[in-house]
Amino acid sequence: MFLCFCTAPILCLWINSGGAVVVSNESLVVCEPVSYPYSLQVLRSFSQRVNLRTKRAVTTDAWSFAYQISTSSLNVNGWYVNFTSPLGWSYPNGKLFGIVLGSDAMMRASVSTFTYDVISYVGQRPNLDCQINDLANGGLESRYSTVRVDNCGNYPCHGGGKPGCSIGHPYMANGVRTRVLLTTQSPGIQYEIYSGQDYAVYQITPYTQYTVTMPSGTSGYCQQTPLYVECGSWTPYRVHAYGCDKATQSCNYTISSDWVVAFKSKASAIILRSQLIVALAQKLSRTVGVNKAVYFWFLKQPYHYLSLVNFSPNYALFSPLCKSLRQQSATYSALSYGSPFFVAQECYNNALYLPDCCLYTLFSILFSWDYQVNYPVNNVLQANETFLQLPTTGYLGQTVSQGRMLNLFKDAIVFLDFYDTKFYRTNDGPGGDIFAVVVKQVPVIAYSAFRIEQQTGYLAVKCNGVIQATLAPHSSRVVLLARHMSMWSIAAANSTTIYCPIYTLTSFVRLDISTSWYFHTLAQPSGPIQQVSMPVLSTGAAGVYMHPMIEHWVTLLAQSSVYQPSMFNMGVNKSVTLTTQLQAYAQVYTAWFLSILYTRLPESRRLTLGAQLTPFIQALLSFKQADIDATDVDTVARYNVLILMWGRKYAAVIYNQLPEWSYPLFKGGVGDSMWFRKKFLVTTKIHQTASHFPFIAGYLDFLDYKYIPKYKDVACPLSTMVPSILQVYETPQLFVIIVQCVSTTYSWYPGLRNPHTIYRSYKLGTICVLVPYSSPTDVYSSFGFFFQSALTIPTVQTTDDILPGCVGFVQDSVFTPCHPSGCPVRNSYDNYIICPGSSASNYTLRNYYRTTTPVTNVPIEEVPLQLEIPTVSLTSYELKQSESVLLQDIEGGIVVDHNTGSIWYPGGQAYDVSFYVSVIIRYAPPKLELPSTLANFTSCLDYICFGNQQCRGEAQTFCTSMDYFEQVFNKSLTSLITALQDLHYVLKLVLPETTLELTEDTRRRRRAVDEFSDTISLLSESFERFMSPASQAYMANMMWWDEAFDGISLPQRTGSILSSAPSLSSISSWHSYSSRTPLISNVKTPKTTFNVKLSMPKLPKASTLSTIGSVLSSGLSIASLGLSIFSIIEDRRVIELTQQQIMALEDQITILAGYTTKNFEEIQSSLNTLGQQVQDFSQTSALSLQQLSNGFEQITQQLDKSIYYVMAVQQYATYMSSLVNQLNELSQAVYKTQDMYITCIHSLQSGVLSPNCITPFQICHLYQVAKNLSSGECQPILSEREISRFYSLPLVTDAMVHNDTYWFSWSIPITCSNILGSVYKVQPGYIVNPHHPTSLQYDVPTHVVTSNAGALIFDEHYCDRYNQVYLCTKSAFDLAEASYLTMLYSNQTDNSSLTFHPAPRPDPCVYLSASALYCYYSDECHQCVIAVGNCTNRTVTYENYTYPIMDPQCRGFDQITISSPIAIGADFTALPSRPPLPLHLSYVNVTFNVTLPNELNWTDLVLDYSFKDKVYEISKNITQLHEQILQVSNWASGWFQRLRDFLYGLIPAWITWLTLGFSLFSILISGVNIILFFEMNGKVKKS
């Protein structure tokens, strides 16, 4: 797409996919887009105003992405760094033109490192030099810099120039004027040479040689002398000078730098993001015809205007505050691990993002330490409640002046652009941190011994009555206070940081915050929604609240159709003249706030939300334009951006001056500029000669310590001595150099190559800290290495909190400079502090120990953080005093709990496996009533990552598997519904009303059929609710997933899932299972006695039998559900038989044979004939169930038209009656399966692996699995607070059956580092009692042995601890309650003793597990629990012997790895069951062998994209299942005919089909084994 819009004859905007360039008739410049992480995605690009000006006219545009150096002396955290050698230039008429590095000189770190060469030929010595001096008015009037390119040869020069030859016009004594271009514009230097009337513009670009030929004919010029210069970016603060020692040969110099000194460009520029092409074209098309170019801010990046603001009073205020924050964070980094100060530390390491993270840090501290962020309970705020609650301190005044409110609006909204909704929370902090914002300056601000007093117009900062600093008041009349421990930061017109101990906490004295926008930022909408606070400017509080739940917030706005956003009640005294104007400001910034939240949402949520927000925002912007004060250009510009963004069609308001945020952020003035340290990444070279540093790029003046050197590379004498780190840190007095150059035997320590050693090193771990050792005798330009013993670090005891005069401390291989007042001495830490030595140039490094207990700060009254998103309560973290909980990046799946030390990190394998398995298990939840506000969640990634982009990549493979699983699951549900509907259709056809005599029994059966029809409809509706929006299934799962971070277990369900009266629970609570209507209520098995009236209905059509065939085919869809259908049909006559009479099918065949003696030969002949027919039919059906139905039709057509058909009707009636019962059983099985899933989830939450999650036969087959568990170090499991904990499974070494009880032996070959030998021996285990009538109906365990339970193995006693009591048995096979022994347990940690006692009897619900991995089955509890024990070495004495106690430090593995190949077969005879009538089941076992590729485990398979393909490949083998079905079906059909022929003459007779069903079971762990069971058995008894 290529578009061109010309809004004026002299301005064309070219738009294509690569960007856009503003082309004027003056020049062409392309700017670099700034990589800014927190910028708005819609307003991401920036542009600059394009001015029409004459050549030589002066522009006032500022750069949008860099920081200026506007003074010759920089303030570095309280001390000053001076620059020397000022350089200026003048006009040809001699008038001073400007001084270098004014407002147009910026410094920034570049993403890339530029390398450029300066080439000198014979007779030339090119010298690039950039110097700095004091600038008038902070350098705001300077326009250009000067780069002098001197000849420095023997050529004659103009008398007006300096020695050597200056390039340029002779009247320009200081050479040519230049500027450095941007990195994306071929970084280089553009310079102009004055030619008498105009300037000739040249450009020198990196990697390109240029020949600059000087004009000839004038005395003093460098006549026709070629000069080759190759240059790019400059190093910080100084373009280093290079020279050749000899002028008789050519030489070149290489400079590498990642810094750019940027000067003023002559023309403005714009780059458009590609994703904004269409929108921009649409918007600009509406402005054609506007003559003035006032739209340059359409796509203004927020970072642009924030970094450029200098008129708004608060910005200069926050700049020194950020510096003070950084100072504190460096000093107290060890103490503030839970606070946001480390963010400030990081931001100072990268100058490019300074405003972002400083304001980010400020708001994080401000809104998470002092104030309580309240979220509405039940979607409403209580009386006298706001989103932002103040501390329990008395504040005065609640009014605000009109004008100040307008200013505060503007100031507040700018910070919002950088406020990120992630926040860090500390309760009481490390030592009680506090932030205070005082808007109205008062005579005294007191906090214990700390005071700020107004004295003669200045602010005197006192501690214990002693003035520590004097600050000038800020123009905004705002003072910012920050306290961390006993360090105070105060920011007004300038800033300072002092140390003032705090012993008691008092209230603020006369602290008036009445005009602070921090606290007056909420407005309430009029209309029906009276109690919902509408955030207008509460950027911190409302931002935290609205970002995660913005959809919920928008629904509140939409509740009232008559809601008028223009009717805000601002809660301030509004004058009549300013009411509408104030209203306009409020609405503009409210719309701006919502727009920022909107643009920060992920795309999927943004699309959904946009339609809801658009009318509301347009309503906000519906006031008259005249209501906006045209002089307030900041609000006008925001208003224009909003109407462009949200589709307003009328023109923007035109204003007559630049908005505030188009000016530089840090303007001139001593102490306002920034200074940044950089860590140098060095390259290493191997030299076998004397070791040394190569040339330093520049020089290091040890007398003044002005500049940070830039090392090109570092060398060590031997290959094994490579200095991997070199760091240079500046303090006010010296440079501290840290070198890491360590070998296995000795270290090299740095000095100089000459005998005069000015630096010596201290060995501290793997680093060497170099500090001045003696006074330098010269200015050195290089360092060298030579072997020298390191100085010892003495340990010094001190009682001082602060060591005055010391310069900094070393911790974790990093040097941190201290405040000028001195270095703090922390308690319980090593304090390696550098202090002045015996002489002025000598410094020492010592380890200081505090010998007195530090002052304990009285903590501020705790303000708890209640994170209550509606209908979800996140309350698992208990915040206590002196503890800190850091919730870091919850959206990304990382939870760090400092209380327990547990970590849930998404990068490990344990995360992946538990992630997948846990979601698989809980993917069949009950129907949930979900809040309507969550109905728009449509993506798996949306739920898991919640907008976190980094998480999306990590969770992609998981969501792919989940999406496929959901497709299969939903398809299976649909197939089940279809099958049930078809069965009902068959019932209607085969049981017509005309064939039944409507007795009470038949009416009851008829009602059963109709009820079955209703049941199908209800089941279908229930499944449709489960399937229809995919979000419901997702949300049901994500409910558990969210709680995995919070440690909240799901509550137990109340009531039975099949009870006639469903349990009542709040449908609005995510935590409660919603009330469900049972699919079949009060189901009674109908009698199968049919009083058949002998009539001659029509023969069932082929379509009917086809429907039956489709029912049979639905078994495959049931397979994916993992259902087991047990059909038990009961006949009235059968009840009268004894169990022995119907125990075995062979007995019935014997009975049948007695009836068929005289007709046996005829039956046999008929069976042979039918058998051949069935065989032919089986061969011709060709795996098609439709052909099977045709076969049924062929057999039916052979029926006799009279008595045979009457019998068939009877049999069909009986068969269909059986189907009714079977479908009732099916519905119960569906619920039973759901209960099993739910119970399994509950068990997992309780740390229990119950039979609902794994069956005994699976344990048997885990032998191959467990063989791959390698022994080694103990591996931890997830924290107690995680919702899902997965224990490793044992090695099953043997299995046997003893007295109808299944026994398993197992061992766990784990060798721990703290235990000698293998932990566990082979122990027998008791799994389940097959004779218990409810052995398949496990419930949630009522008692669970806690995870800290140890286990004892005595000679013949097997013991486990429960509630401080050890329960022991004499033998693992003797679990009778009378055989229990009880040992009392002592709480003593050392030499704990256990004593056996014969009483009391134990709780029957306690299982014996832990280290021996027992499973105790209790009739009272109906549970079987498996757990894995521990391996910490503790002992106990019993009968003069010492036995080990296993403590819960090692609980096995987090995952199970299965090596290839693997084949798991299944035999379900081990499944215990006691149905009302015994079943004799026949099985058709189909086992698939799955071979995994080498080096691939199940974890990789489950989370791999190819997992789908593997499942599809397995599905191809289902053809074999169809063949099995055909064989069984043909056999059943043949037997059906055999029985019908045999029953000729035996009317009436009653046929009961005992079993007709598909029994399908899918092994959850492997996910690929499908076992199909199909059987049809018949019983007959003569009437």
From Swiss-Prot:
Keywords: Fusion of virus membrane with host membrane, Glycoprotein, Host-virus interaction, Membrane, Signal, Transmembrane, Transmembrane helix, Viral attachment to host cell, Viral envelope protein, Viral penetration into host cytoplasm, Virion, Virulence, Virus entry into host cell. The chain crosses the membrane at residues 1554-1574. Residues 1-20 form the signal peptide. It is found in: Virion membrane. Glycans are attached at residues 25, 82, 252, 384, 494, 573, 842, 936, 970, 1268, 1299, 1387, 1391, 1430, 1433, 1440, 1485, 1489, 1497, 1517. Residues 1575-1583 are intravirion. Residues 21-1553 are virion surface. The keyword Glycoprotein applies. GO terms for biological process: membrane fusion involved in viral entry into host cell; symbiont entry into host cell; virion attachment to host cell. Pfam families: Spike_torovirin (PF17072). It is a single-pass type I membrane protein. GO terms for cellular component: membrane; viral envelope; virion membrane. Homotrimer. Mediates the binding of virions to the host cell receptor and is involved in membrane fusion. Belongs to the torovirinae spike protein family. This is Spike glycoprotein. It comes from Breda virus 1. The lineage of its organism: Viruses, Riboviria, Orthornavirae, Pisuviricota, Pisoniviricetes. The gene is S.
